[in-house]
Amino acid sequence: MQVQILNGIYASNTPELRTSYPVNMIPVPKKSGISNGFLRPGDGIVGNGTGPGIDRGGIYWNGIVYRVMGTKLVTVDSGGNVTTLGDVGGPSGELVTLDYSFDLLGIASGGRLYFWNPATLTLAQNTDADLGTVLDFCWVDGYFMTTDGTNLVVTELTDPFAVNPIKYGSSEADPDPVMALLKLRNEVYALNSNTIEVFDNVGGALFPFQRIAGAQIQKGVVGTHACCQYLERIAFVGGGRNEAPAIYVGADATTQKISTQEIDDLLLQYTESQLSLVQLESRTYKDHQYLYVHLPNGSLVYDAAASAALGEQVWFALTTAVVGFAQYRARNFVWAFDKWLVSDPQSSAIGYLVQDTGHHWGDQVRW
């Protein structure tokens, strides 16, 4: 007889039994005489530095870790030392998008687009009036593609600071606003609120990208950062028209729902405006394939590798609290210097994940 220890059930004030997922404990598939897995303590968070503000996003490029902390673009070395490069403005509480070309690092902050050039050590804003508001962006085939929620805009191939208004494109299969842009296998995914459209570079004198009609996904995303690349697909929180929010992975016109009924119930506890601020991140480490869903009072984590090994959806919860649930205080994961670098969403602290302690920033947390 096998003992189920990777999750449990409990009674609530509804007629249904609810699923109880591990809190700050990570399910690990491992067959034994009594169970098909075990729980190990969640990763600890160790601080090693501070920056000029709360971290808003990070990226590793050409051997250097870049972060936007407060309104400042900074670099972080292996010891946690922070060097300020320039100012990209606020709001300091909003996440940024970072992506790079061969020679420029792009930063979308507060509706603006900036470029850091490490060769000249200069930070400059794209001030072309035809660029418009930059809600999100990605780099693809030599272009920086941005969206203001309505149009798809590309910079000139020979000048990333120039925009030609006759080269605007749009995501028009459904009259829903564009929420985010992601690149997957050199195709651009325009994630709208009810649909996801895929574009490929076909060249031409006007907008150089063309919609791949057969690749459209009939579901959308709830917010700009509620999506990420995961397992060579796109993971997102959202749904189609007249659908409650859930968590999916999708690509090439197909989706797979990975959220369970319990996870869906937890999502329904948040308002639409709260869900619009959800952040998704992925992290592959030691035979685990994690998808983090950062919510206001904790983070839900899906493990695709464990789910495949156990034949059921494996979820667990992370929280930086001794009692109850509170915001999980590790965000914006960056693999660099042989460790996972993280930041604290509630302070200017930066650090890294460890497995020899379960403390978060020196404080004890619950199980």
Residue ranges and their predicted role:
Residues 58, 105-107, 111, 136-153, ...:
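Carboxylate-rich, polar loop motifs that coordinate divalent cations or form catalytic acidic clusters
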Residues 77-80, 117-121, 158-160, 201-204, ...:
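Short loop/turn segments that connect beta-strands within beta-propeller blades
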Residues 118-142, 165-168:
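Asp-box/WD-like beta-propeller blade repeats and closely related beta-sheet repeat scaffolds
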Residues 189-214:
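Surface-exposed extracellular loop regions of Gram-negative outer-membrane beta-barrel proteins
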